[in-house]
């Protein structure tokens, strides 16, 4: 028999969201565990920045090529994250 009480009893989650999260079970897909060694972390950071730079360069080249071949100027659309609250059709009063 055990000597004394258990220190940490299993408790039910207080909120519904936490209870649902717990009962959902394991998620699909693989897990990505980051490296511990500083040198490998640095290499991955460098690799990521190079990949981003290369991708931006390729996108820029494609846009320049497309805009030079079109008779009308090519308009680029940026993400909708810049619009914060203000709707384009209405003016504040």
Curated annotation (Swiss-Prot):
Sequence ranges of Low complexity compositional bias: 7-18
Domain of life of the source: Eukaryota
Chain intervals with Basic residues compositional bias: 25-39
Summary of the tissues where the protein is detected: Leydig cell tumor, testis and placenta.
Region described as Disordered: 1-41
Cross-referenced InterPro entries: UPF0390
Name of the protein described by the UniProt record: Leydig cell tumor 10 kDa protein
């Amino acid at each position: 028999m055990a000597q004394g009480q258990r220190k940490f009893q299993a408790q039910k989650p207080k909120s519904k969201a936490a209870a649902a999260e717990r009962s959902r079970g394991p998620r699909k897909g693989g897990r990505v565990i980051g490296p511990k060694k500083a040198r490998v972390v640095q290499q991955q950071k460098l690799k990521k920045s190079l990949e981003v730079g290369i991708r931006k360069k390729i996108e820029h080249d494609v846009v320049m090529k497309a805009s030079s071949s079109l008779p009308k100027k090519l308009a680029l659309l940026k993400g909708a994250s810049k619009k914060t609250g203000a709707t384009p059709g209405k003016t504040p009063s």
